[in-house]
């Protein structure tokens, strides 16, 4: 059983398990300088990720393409909302340059929502994948895409470029969508993930949710069932952390042993991989997890 030692957020003090070291290493600085010199955005900075110090010190970064202005206004997200800039046609080349210079074995590419573009930015994702494949053929590629709501088959443009991992986050339970993710539709996100798997079963599919927003345990388990019905391979579960006072409140800080409980249940439901901890984020340890995913698939085949 999981503990009842969950901490209500009204205390406004983060528990010890959510405290991380400030980023000061030389490796962090060199990663930061390279990303700035190539004029790339990262979700690490834009979304105020708590793991930025650890990841950048290991030369891991999640690049955010298609600008830094989002057309949505999700209640949990730190990315700016407004009218986006024009698509930078040279960005795929600069991204491939960064991958090559950092010597990345695994790269994660995400983006803001671009409801203003006819395909939601899907063709730009595909160009980024193509450029990286040409210049760094041994690098595995993971995409974390928007939901491409009302962009018919836009996901297929990305899938045809054959990323190794296709990630799209479900983010929260259905009952909280209007409050947390009002511009999205739960079943649209589920369908996207399922369609990718139907299109090419060799592409690993991945999704994640945040907890601590007011969901119940039963609702979290139901999301697991829905994702397994969509044949999702990899589930991530992490604590929601409020980026600023203008964002939705944290309902509670979920104790580490409750995350352990979720991980055990998710594994029993058939996910190939599960990462569940207070500081888990979609791209956290993504390269290591990809290698484990490949091993797990081989074991299942054998």
Curated annotation (Swiss-Prot):
Binding site for [4Fe-4S] cluster 2: 70, 74, 77
Main subcellular location of this protein, as a coarse class: cytoplasm
Keywords: 4Fe-4S, Cytoplasm, Iron, Iron-sulfur, Metal-binding, S-adenosyl-L-methionine, Transferase
Residue numbers binding [4Fe-4S] cluster 1: 44, 49, 55, 283
Name of the featured protein: Lipoyl synthase
Family label: Belongs to the radical SAM superfamily. Lipoyl synthase family.
CDD domains: Radical_SAM
Organism per entry: Orientia tsutsugamushi (strain Ikeda) (Rickettsia tsutsugamushi)
């Amino acid at each position: 059983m999981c503990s009842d030692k969950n901490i209500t957020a009204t205390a406004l003090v983060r528990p010890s398990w959510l405290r991380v070291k400030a980023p000061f290493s030389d490796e962090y600085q060199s990663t930061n300088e390279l990303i700035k010199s190539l004029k790339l955005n990262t979700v690490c900075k834009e979304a105020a990720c708590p793991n930025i110090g650890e990841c950048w010190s290991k030369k891991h970064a999640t690049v955010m393409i298609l600008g830094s202005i989002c057309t949505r206004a999700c209640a949990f997200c730190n990315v700016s909302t407004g009218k986006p800039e024009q698509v930078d046609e040279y960005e795929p080349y600069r991204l491939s340059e960064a991958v090559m210079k950092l010597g990345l074995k695994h790269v994660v590419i995400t983006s803001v929502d671009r409801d203003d573009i006819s395909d939601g930015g899907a063709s730009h994702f595909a160009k980024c994948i193509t450029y990286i494949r040409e210049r760094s053929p041994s690098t595995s590629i993971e995409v974390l895409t928007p939901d491409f709501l009302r962009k018919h088959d836009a996901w297929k443009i990305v899938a045809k470029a054959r990323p190794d991992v296709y990630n799209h986050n479900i983010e929260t339970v259905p009952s909280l969508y209007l409050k947390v993710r009002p511009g999205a539709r739960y079943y649209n996100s589920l369908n996207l993930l399922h369609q990718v798997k139907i299109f090419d079963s060799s592409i690993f599919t991945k999704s994640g949710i945040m907890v601590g927003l007011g969901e119940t345990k039963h609702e979290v388990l139901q999301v697991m069932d829905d994702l397994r019905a969509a044949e999702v391979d990899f589930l991530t579960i992490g604590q929601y952390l409020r980026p600023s006072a203008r964002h939705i409140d944290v309902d509670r800080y979920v104790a580490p042993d409750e995350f352990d409980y979720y991980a055990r249940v998710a594994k029993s439901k058939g996910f190939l991989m599960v990462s569940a901890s207070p500081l888990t984020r979609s791209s956290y340890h993504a390269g290591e997890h990809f290698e484990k995913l490949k091993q797990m698939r081989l074991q299942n085949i054998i």
